[in-house]
Amino acid sequence: METISTAAYDRGWQSQWDDMKKYGPFSRHLRRIIQQIIRPLEFQSVLDVGCGQGSLMQELQAEFPRITPYGIDLSASAVELARERVSGGCFRVMDITKGSLDEKYDLVVCSEVLEHLPDDMTALQNLRKMTGKYLLISAPQGRMREFERQYGHVRNYAAGELTDKIERSGFAVESVVEWGFPFYSPLYRDFLEVTGSKGTTGEFGAVRKLISNAIYYLFLLNSSRRGDEIFVLAQPVASS
């Protein structure tokens, strides 16, 4: 079981992942599906756990201009970028496995984080402390590829595992979306397993942006009922 060091994670945000998060087809679909799931909900304060450089919060602000944005991330470099890019936001460096903020937020989003954490149950318990109304989690499930291990994945969830852990952490699951079959997973993930993932990182020039955009539109043909990317919307259960 490999984990990525804090220093390596910070270096990734300094030089490797910014354009991938902005222009990469998978990251764009993550944001699209998150927005689709939360659109019917009522919320004002939003906490993005694992906020990175703020790309999700930028899009949420554009669609929901009245929200109050907050974010935490392990990387000081990512947090600095988020502070520069998200107007009116409050962003802090924090390890979700070691603590929580004192406040509660209407909506807590934790996207593509738990698969990196050896102690995901402690992270979920800390998320519970900060969730006022809704928690939305996205994570991979199914077979783990080698390039995902290189990105610091310590697990991909088995069927039913993530929802079970969420419920054991004091939440009631409201809805589940499974997405990605067949073009994202298995086809795109298997392609990256064979070719390596270097082409997805670093600066995106005009050609890479064009290719990424084409793949984004191909991914629109993926099933929203079947796939290895899972989105779970949950609400905290009142303490008895």
Regions found by a protein language model. Give the residues of each.
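Conserved N-terminal segment of class I S-adenosyl-L-methionine
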Residues: 1-107, 111, 121-124, 156-160, ...
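A generic structural signal for alpha->beta connector loops
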Residues: 66, 88, 132, 170-173
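Short, glycine-/aromatic-enriched active-site segment of Class I SAM-dependent methyltransferases
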Residues: 135-155, 159-161
